[in-house]
A protein has these predicted regions:
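C-terminal capping alpha-helices of c-type cytochrome domains
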Residues: 80-91, 97-122
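Sec-dependent bacterial lipoprotein signal peptides
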Residues: 1-26
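Electrostatic cytochrome c docking/interface patches
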Residues: 23-38, 54-55, 122
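Detector for the c-type heme attachment site
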Residues: 27-28, 46-52, 86, 98
Length: 122
């Protein structure tokens, strides 16, 4: 009976290790080029090609977010930025939740973070 328990425990450990290896291997890394391209095709129209915020989308409306705003960048986590992208904002930004998958969101958020650091470097 003891050998059966040892075998069962060994099997569970092996399956757990295999599962962890698979999940780590399947998780895609941030792709800077993809983040830049997604921004250019989806965000730049309102937020400006360089991320400095564009003109209001509608008369009397707020200006789109300036991603060079260091305080804004520091006050929000990557998860908060992803939620804004996924859900949109009441200020006129539409929801992009059905457009981007998790890996694309990570790449896009990484690009938004780079916009702030690029301005700081100038």
């Amino acid at each position: 009976m003891t050998s059966l328990r040892v075998a069962a425990a060994a099997l569970l450990l092996t399956l757990g290790a295999a599962s962890a290896a698979l999940s780590t291997g399947c998780e895609k890394k941030v792709d800077p080029a993809q983040g830049r391209d997604l921004y250019a095709s989806t965000c730049a129209r309102c937020h400006g090609a360089d991320g400095s915020g564009g003109l209001p989308v509608f008369d009397g409306g707020p200006r789109p977010r300036n991603f060079h705003d260091h305080a804004f960048q520091n006050e929000r986590t990557d998860e908060q930025l992803k939620l804004i992208i996924v859900n949109g904002k009441s200020t006129g930004m539409p929801s992009f939740g059905v457009i981007f998958d998790e890996q694309q969101l990570r790449s896009l958020v990484a690009h938004l973070r780079r916009l702030d650091s690029e301005k700081a470097a100038k």
